[in-house]
Every structure is written in structure tokens, then in C-alpha cells.
Amino acid sequence: MLLGLGGRWAAGLWPGRTRTTWCVAAALRGSGIAFWRAASLAEPERLRSGGHLALAESCGPPGRAQIPVCWEQCVRCFHTQVDKPENGRLIYTGNLARTIFGVKCFSYSTSVVSLAFLPYLLSQNNMMFGSLPLQVLFYGVMGSFTVITPTLLHLLTKGYVIRLYHEATSDTYRAVTYNVMLSETSTVFHQDDVTIPESAHIFTSFYAKTKSLLVNPALFLNPEDYNHLMGYDKPFTFDMEEVDEKKLHEGEK
């Protein structure tokens, strides 16, 4: 084993006094954990003559200790797949998922705090606010922070797609979104179920059956996946009957 590290290192160590310790460096790559290198560390011993420590010499350039290239292939990596195989291939990941989650958590927390202080405020109503307009204004502001704001946030962000998977064999998609309880919910639909709104909507990119979903075309890992999702890769058909009907209606007007 010492001969694999170099003859000069093996000659500098006392016979029978070598201790080899194996360590594996774990590196996080992508969604798995890979074992890449195994290093052999030898305990330095004093030489018989000089009394100095024997330095380990590398297989590469002088003055830089490194592991031989042949050792890098000793330990093969194993990959832990995060996404389940039945989910399909991940084609889209939303970059605002954490932001939406944090904003909704903050809104829910303020609502809970407001509801917790509501009994105390009701008991101190006459002492704090003497006039009726001030009471109406105060409770209106509290109601907006307690009920209206979380509801509005949910209505605006319920269609935001966190992740989108595509199953090529059945041409089905699985869109992951947040529900009202901030847990992930899935919507499975076929490509034929995708309809594009006639007019542009701020919070709707397309409809999957009857549910509106919002995606950012620039965040797709492959632009062809977005084109296939929206049906842009289908051949264009020009129906002459529809054109004749439109001309007929325009002539009647």
C-alpha cells in the first residue's frame, strides 16, 4: 500500500510503525451525497539520523501535497434521488417559493396576534376610544390585517407553481403549489387540458382544466419544455370555415 503512495515516502517511515487511516470526504452535489476521495494518512516518525519529521511527498509538483489521481476512482459515489420517479422529470422550479412562504407566514402570524389581543381590546373599548368613528376606523384596520390581507395573499399566490414535473410517456404534468395551510398540493393534468387565456392576466399563465397556474417562462430548464406545455410546438392549422364565418358576421354588422 505504501508503494502506491511513492517509494521515497515508504523509505522514510520505520518498518512496522505505519498506521493507515482511511477517511472519506463527503461532498453535497445536486440533490445527493457523493463520496469522491479516500486519503491515506500516515503518522510521521522521526528518522534515525537527523531527528526531523519525515514529510510526505506528493505524486504531483513539489511543495504541494495531493492525493494521487489513481486514488480518486477508488470510492465510487452513490446518489440519493430526492424526486420520486413517479413524479416525472423536473422541468421547472419557481424562484419566489420561499418569498411567498415567508410573506404568508408573516401575514398569518400577525392575524393570530391580532385575534389574541382582540378580547382585551374589546374590554377596553370604552376607555380607549370614546367616539364611534374612531372605533369603526380601528376595527376596520384590525379586520383588514386579520382577515382581508391573508385572504388576498392566498388568492393572488394560490396559482404560483413551485415545481413542475413532466411524465413523457403519458404526457402528463404535475404542478406543485401552496394551499391555504402553506402545505404543498399537487395538480395533475394532461397537455390537452392546458388552455391559454385569450387576454393577458397578471397572475395566470395558463389554465390546467379549470385551475389557473402561474409560471415564469425564463425559469424553465429547457425552453422546449415550455413550448410543449403551452402547445407552441403543435402544427398550426388555419380553418377557412371560421374565417368565412367571421367575414359573414362582419358583413352583417
Swiss-Prot record:
Any idea which residues the transit peptide spans? 1-77
Instruction: Please describe the organ and tissue distribution of this protein's expression.
Output: Higher expressed in the heart than in the liver (at protein level).
Q: Where are the transmembrane segments?
A: 100-120, 136-156
Q: Name one GO molecular function term.
A: mitochondrial proton-transporting ATP synthase complex binding
What ranges does the Mitochondrial matrix topological domain annotation cover?
Answer: 78-99, 157-253
Per UniProt, subcellular location reads as: Mitochondrion inner membrane
Q: Which residues lie on this side of the membrane: Mitochondrial intermembrane?
A: 121-135
Subunit relationships: Homooligomer. Interacts (homooligomer form) with ATP5MC1; this interaction facilitates the oligomer formation of subunit c/ATP5MC1 (c-ring) and the c-ring membrane insertion and also protects ATP5MC1 against intramitochondrial proteolysis. Interacts with the core subunits TMEM126B, NDUFAF1, ECSIT and ACAD9 of the MCIA complex. Interacts with ATP5MC3, TMEM242 and TIMMDC1.
What is the purpose of this protein? Scaffold protein that participates in the c-ring assembly of mitochondrial ATP synthase (F(1)F(0) ATP synthase or complex V) by facilitating the membrane insertion and oligomer formation of the subunit c/ATP5MC1 through its interaction. Therefore, participates in the early stage of mitochondrial ATP synthase biogenesis and also protects subunit c/ATP5MC1 against intramitochondrial proteolysis. In addition, binds the mitochondrial proton-transporting ATP synthase complexes I and may play a role in the stability of its membrane-bound subassemblies.
Protein family according to the UniProt entry: Belongs to the TMEM70 family.
Q: What is this protein called?
A: Transmembrane protein 70, mitochondrial
Record organism: Mus musculus (Mouse)
